[in-house]
Amino acid sequence: MIKKLFALSILAVTLLIQPTHAQSAEQLHQTAKSFMKQGDYANAVLVLNKSLQIAPDNMSIAKDLAMSYYFQKDNIKALETIKPVLDSKDADDQSFQIAGNIYKQLDQRNELEKLYKKGIKKFPESGPLYNELGEAVFTNSKLDAIKYWEKGIQADPGYSKNYNNAARYYFFTTDKVWTIIYGEMFVNMEPTGNSTPEMKQILLDAYKKLFTENDLEKNNKDKNNFVKSYLETMNKQAAVTNAGINAEVLSMIRARFVIDWFATNTKPAFKLFSLHQQLLKEGMFEAYNQWLFGATENLSAYENWVKTHAAENTAFTALQKSRMFKAPADQYYH
């Protein structure tokens, strides 16, 4: 009887200790996160190691420890820490991104490619992993890179960086459509992003490239119905470009394009064009086009436009801040 009571006492003490340890591990983890935010990775490593000792199966702690080693440029330790995470049932696509950053810093390109392919096999709908794999193979195989970025757009249409890379890739090819489509989608997904000003310039140049030919459909070899419909509709606006391309002309061309696109119910549904239609109806389409092209094409003219259209610009800016652009999963046409 005494033995049984002793055993029960030990069990009770163990059960009481376990939650305390778990809580302590979480408290330590939060402390370490504060150090990470401050850029104090030495202290973060110190605290995370203690936290992981209490909760060795906590993959979130292990990921942060690997990242802290990475930022300290202790890549061997970082790799040792992240590898068990990759093989665990709790691995997520972020785990593979962290490991990828470590392999990049170690300049182990072959391992990097294998890692991302392994990650995609486990997470076939991860836009970030397709994007990273595309960037990893770009130097050796641009064709493979664009395939991965396209797959990323198809699998995870809400992730922006595949659009960015794909738009830049197509700009340096004979393609006339997808730089414009993907570039504008990226800008709407990241309206204040660091890459957005450069993408706006690419978009402006892409429209100039599009209207170089008098007949936009003439040399089109793409049998894609979306592309054919796009070029056919845009071709009707070619005469408007006789005086060149600028923000005002593009606003006119694109307004007419949207009206024509929605004139019948035969064109494919497309979120970007639906946004254009909404802005037209609400009287903000010119403000949107000025935001998209104005500052890039002529900064002083854009600043003057903002002054003379203050109410329109304010209304658009408020809308821009309140919305989030996300492409639907069923509107991939390439």
Outline where the language-model segments fall:
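Canonical tetratricopeptide repeat
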Residues: 64-67, 97-98, 132, 165, ...
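Structural motif corresponding to the intra-repeat A-B loop/turn of tetratricopeptide repeats
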Residues: 38, 72, 106, 139-140, ...
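Eukaryotic alpha-helical solenoid repeat scaffolds
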Residues: 158-334
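TPR alpha-solenoid repeat register
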Residues: 61, 95, 129, 162, ...
